[in-house]
Amino acid sequence: MSAFPLIIGVDEAGRGPWAGPVTAAAVILDPAQPIEGLTDSKKLSEKARDRLAPLIRERALAWCVAEASVEEIDTLNIRQATFLAMRRAILGQSRTDQDRSGQFETVSATAGLILIDGNALPGDLPAPARAIIKGDLTEPAISAASILAKTHRDAQMASLCNLYPGYGFSGHKGYGTAAHAAALTRLGPCPVHRQSFAPVRALLRPC
């Protein structure tokens, strides 16, 4: 890996939930500004993630958070929608300017390798890429991407909780908990539920 000038680390958050978008982040870390405590976001407490996320945004050479919508998940399937979110993050195609660092495209264009957590790669990437199983535990850039993707998506789900009260999105973040299942049964699916997911599809009716 040392032969490559810069590495883009990529990870996603939100493949499994019944509701909300799937989010991906791409991060190029600065070797001159190491960040202590980077690991898989799922291994960290919410407090630790919230502490690390601004450090990553501050110290990384470049970063971007992107997503694929519920509609894209239902149209493409969750695997392809995840790949779409990853490609968008790698290319700097965030939903807003606040979701990426300045000059992201300029910096990322100099990267020689893309490291993606998992066992499969999206197609049509701008640089050589490798999939690394449990890469969020072994590659700091992937760990950083994992944290940015997770904290960004969690904040989105908290906002959706205000738009669609009663489902408890700020707590379970759209995952299939008992409380979420009970709310679905009581209220029916709402517009941010993934209709292609079986537990939601079984209850399709206006909310």
Swiss-Prot record:
Enzyme Commission code(s) on record: 3.1.26.4
Cofactor binding remark: Manganese or magnesium. Binds 1 divalent metal ion per monomer in the absence of substrate. May bind a second metal ion after substrate binding.
GO BP, one annotated term: DNA replication, removal of RNA primer
Functional note: Endonuclease that specifically degrades the RNA of RNA-DNA hybrids.
RNase H type-2 domain segment(s): 5-207
Name of the protein: Ribonuclease HII
One Pfam family hit: RNase_HII
GO CC terms of this entry: cytoplasm; ribonuclease H2 complex
Family of the protein in this entry: Belongs to the RNase HII family.
Main localisation: cytoplasm
Positions of a divalent metal cation binding: D11, E12, D117
Subcellular location: Cytoplasm
Keyword Cell inner membrane in record: no
Top enzyme category: hydrolase
Example of a GO MF term: manganese ion binding
Keywords associated with the record: Cytoplasm, Endonuclease, Hydrolase, Manganese, Metal-binding, Nuclease
Nuclease found in the keyword field: yes
